[in-house]
Amino acid sequence: MSLQFILGNSGSGKSHYLYQQIVNESMEHPEKNYLVLVPEQFTMQTQRDLCAAHPRGGIMNIDALSFMRLAYRVFEEVGREEQPVLDDEGKNLVIRRIAGKLEDDLKVLKGNLKKQGYISEVKSVISEFVQYGVDFDKLDDFMEGLSQESYLYYKLQDIRKVYEGFEEYLRDRYITKEEMLDVLARAVCDSELLKGSVIALDGFTGFTPVQIRLISELLKVSEKVIVTVEIDRREDPFIYRHPYQLFALSKQMVTSLVKTAQDAGAEVEESVCLYEKVPYRFRENPEMAFLESELFRYSRRQYKKKKEESETCSGAISLHETKNPREEARYVAESIRKLVREKDYRYRDIAVIAADLNLYADALEKACELFEIPVFMDHKKSILLNSFVEYLRSLLAMAEQNFTYESVFRHLRTGLCGFTDEEIDRLENYCLALDIKGYKKWQQAWVRRTPSTGEKELEELNHLRVIFVEKTMGLIQVLKQKKKTVRDVTQAVYEYLVQEKLQQKIAQLEKKFQDRGELALAKEYAQVYRIVMELFDKFVSLLGEEEIALKDYCELLDAGLEEAKVRSLDKQL
């Protein structure tokens, strides 16, 4: 049982050194398990790097995992049966339902619950409470230090009520992703996979309390735990003074791991130091090496180009100012095209990093399209504006609002109702002219005429009205029942979607976008039906037998859809 750190600057080769060490040891000890734990988003790349580093081009006794994947591996091995894991969409649904029941008791949150995205923010706060071990006692202790007249006091009081209701609902039913690692920590001692293994942690800037508790258990059963730490040679990694010093996160991580190792009875080995005057990554780039060394330091050192560098330096750092994001994106696209044409770069060698990708995404996509640059946007897109989602939301709104003019034509304009644009225009003009609104008026035959409506036109409009009313009649009857459960509404909506062949219509839209070369939209429509069906499954499994008003169901649906995102995969993967 031991703990060892690999220390070095950014670009000094910590990961390379670690992977080579792991590969070499794994070949010498094929009977031993080697686990490389990295953040979730780096697991695939780490697997590729390890395979590339291995002389045989493959890894047999080495696994690259995230903490969550490790949990599933261990649970599968030890046969531990735990409650189902509640994901973020499920949390949103449960919190929205609990907050709705507590609405009259909430002072601050009450007026914000219906705002788009607010439930997701409350969910994030509760998730962080669980992740960082903030229980009700700690929350109460903190609130005691606040004035009872302060806004923060009442806001925390509301969050505590929702948090308490959330915990009560989950008890003996579900566990959250944040609690998975606590469950894993209890299972570590039963795992043969972990006993005597070598565990490496790479790419982390710090660990949450629940991760520290897990690492403590891993130290007790493994042969060795190795951790890479990004830190400068001028800093002492074993002394953490305050959170505002340089490399504070790294120092905090090292000191907390050292204490954890001591408490677990593990030896702290001498650290491997990969300090170099110029980190390996920047050996051909003195400007970047200087920036890495001096950024955020209070020295007055300035970079001065040496004579022998005048020809080799490429102007690695440059600053440019433009009028708006669109001009910025165009400049970036021009620069990328120049690098590819004149300096033999490949598109996959280039990354564009934006402080707010949502602000720049459209401008970058258009600029890259203009210059014929293939681009992959690494961000998730909300499905709230998808036509199928709008079809679903407007369908329920139409029933809840009793066929108001706005709700009816919001639904018809989604393009998925089976009417042509010309037919919808004619219906809309007639309804506007004669103030047709309310379900009763849509059920009754239309007999009044406008100056431009002839007998044949009126007959055709009534034919369209009958088609629309008859197709929605069964669903509307269920939705208007006074007593109905979440299961009743969900089943009725699902059967209506099947009746209207929405899955086939969405597949046709996906093909249309593919034929047009709009691959991002094609990917979105390929996923959206499945996402909504999975959300319906969560409705039934989490809240199925609860009675619910249609208005509350609409809000519940919005809360679930807020968290639902579609994401495209990088073509390289």
Q: Where is each model-derived feature located?
A:
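Accessory N-terminal region flanking or inserted into the helicase ATPase core
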Residues: 2-6, 14, 101-203, 210, ...
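Helicase P-loop NTPase motor core
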Residues: 2-4, 10-26, 32, 40, ...
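PLD-like (HKD) phosphodiesterase/transphosphatidyltransferase domain
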Residues: 5-10, 167-216, 319-339, 474-513, ...
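Conserved P-loop NTPase-based nucleic-acid remodeling module centered on helicase motor cores
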Residues: 31-141, 147
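ATPase/helicase motor core of nucleic-acid motors
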Residues: 55, 70, 104-106, 339-349, ...
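Conserved helicase core region in the C-terminal RecA-like lobe
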Residues: 63-69, 198-207, 211, 226, ...
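Accessory C-terminal helicase-associated subdomains
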Residues: 149-156, 164-165, 169, 310-316, ...
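Extended, H/D-rich, highly charged conserved domains that either
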Residues: 206-280
